[in-house]
Each structure stands twice: as structure tokens, then as C-alpha cells.
Amino acid sequence: MKYVIIYWSRYGHNKKIVNYLAEKLKEKKAETQILTTDEADPAALPEADLYIFSAAAEAFNLQRNMKQFMKNLEEMNGKKYAIINTHGMDKNRLYKMEKLLSKKNMVKVEGVDFKVGTNIKSGNALLEGWEAKLDEFAGKL
């Protein structure tokens, strides 16, 4: 199975998450490709069995680079996806990601969110247990 992972990360939390996830998927003999929103072309994504999108919530919304990337996706009709959202609030933004991708007629497989604690700018604010939560998520893909 081939996974293409598209992410955006300001302080490193989403980068840490997608790198960990890619290793877990490789343990299942999967092929993975990781791209930032700056590296990927939303009009011509590499072929994949499943696309995984990972980004933070910022200013009570989905991070703007990922939001714009999702709006610009082309030729995604019927493609499968999973979503990951990091956030410092009590409410995640998975539903905003879902709404954007449903407009592209994509099919959701799974979603997971990770609340971050204080000291966000350190890049080490993922709360204890994030790896176990991500292991469970990977098992559903």
C-alpha cells in the first residue's frame, strides 16, 4: 500500500507526528512519501492508495497554508484520505478539514487529533501518550 502524507508544521509537532507515522506504516511494509504543503502540488499529487493530511489549528481555524492547499486540490474524486490535527484548544479542527475534502469528493478513512500543551514554540508540547494514540490511528489505515 502506498501512502502520501502532506503536512504543514510551524513548531515541529506535525513534522514529528508524520515522521513517526511513516515509520509505523513502513513496519507494515507500506511505501510512504512525505511532503510539506510547499513541496506538494495540489493539482498533481503523486498517486497513492491513501492520502494523509496533517496540520495545526491556528487562530481558531485550520492553518491557512493547509486550508489553501486543500481548496486547490484537483482530481481527487473517490480518493481515500485520513486527517491529523494538532491544537492547543479544547476543540479540534478535524471537521474543517473534512468539509474541505468532502467538496473534492474524497472518502474519509480515519481522523485523529492531538492537543498540545504549554511551551508550544519548543516543538515538544505534544501531550504524554501521543505515540500510543498515533499507533492506534496507524492500525486503522
Task: Locate the predicted segments by residue.
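FMN-binding flavodoxin-like domain, especially the glycine-rich phosphate-binding loop
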Residues: K16, K24, K28, Q33, ...
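N-terminal beta1-alpha1 ligand-phosphate binding loop
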Residues: K2-K24
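Conserved SAM/SAH-binding loop
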Residues: T37-A40
